[in-house]
Amino acid sequence: MQLTNFTDYGLRALIYMASLPEGRMTSISEVTDVYGVSRNHMVKIINQLSRAGYVTAVRGKNGGIRLGKPASAIRIGDVVRELEPLSLVNCSSEFCHITPACRLKQALSKAVQSFLTELDNYTLADLVEENQPLYKLLLVE
């Protein structure tokens, strides 16, 4: 299974924000500069992360974005569930004549659940805390 770019960059944005000193705001422009992503794409990602409570956006002169909850409270599996369309096959009878007897959808559903259950074992904090090589690559001190 390959995550969409939307989910990939959503996770990267969260990793960046979690790597910053606690309480430090950043901007969408700063995140896009770090990862080389289009601003429009990142705005959509941050909006969805904000609606889900993972990011807080503050307007105004001293505004910006930051994590909406502690990194230790953000499970990677939950973020993937929020951002990723997890339907792996289109099992509509109008598209596939074996749908009434097919067991593929059930097998794939179990595989996706196993994948997400494993990701639930990791929080954003697990990915960033005391990760000096990451801080260096992100130019975060």
From Swiss-Prot:
DNA-binding region coordinates: 28-51
Keywords recorded for this protein, A-Z: 2Fe-2S, DNA-binding, Iron, Iron-sulfur, Metal-binding, Repressor, Transcription, Transcription regulation
InterPro entries, per database record: TR_Rrf2-type_CS (IPR030489), Tscrpt_reg_Rrf2 (IPR000944), Tscrpt_rep_HTH_NsrR (IPR023761), WH-like_DNA-bd_sf (IPR036388), WH_DNA-bd_sf (IPR036390)
Keyword DNA-binding part of the UniProt annotation: yes
Highest taxon listed in the record's lineage: Bacteria
Keyword Thylakoid tagged: no
Recorded GO CC terms: cytosol
Obligatory cofactor(s): [2Fe-2S] cluster
Note accompanying the cofactor annotation: Binds 1 [2Fe-2S] cluster per subunit.
PROSITE patterns: HTH_RRF2_1, HTH_RRF2_2
Amino-acid positions noted as binding [2Fe-2S] cluster in the UniProt annotation, renumbered to this chain: 91, 96, 102
Residue span, HTH rrf2-type domain: 2-129
GO terms of biological process kind: negative regulation of DNA-templated transcription
GO molecular function list: 2 iron, 2 sulfur cluster binding; DNA-binding transcription factor activity; double-stranded DNA binding; iron ion binding
UniProt function note: Nitric oxide-sensitive repressor of genes involved in protecting the cell against nitrosative stress. May require iron for activity.
Name the record gives this protein: HTH-type transcriptional repressor NsrR
Organism: Shigella boydii serotype 18 (strain CDC 3083-94 / BS512)
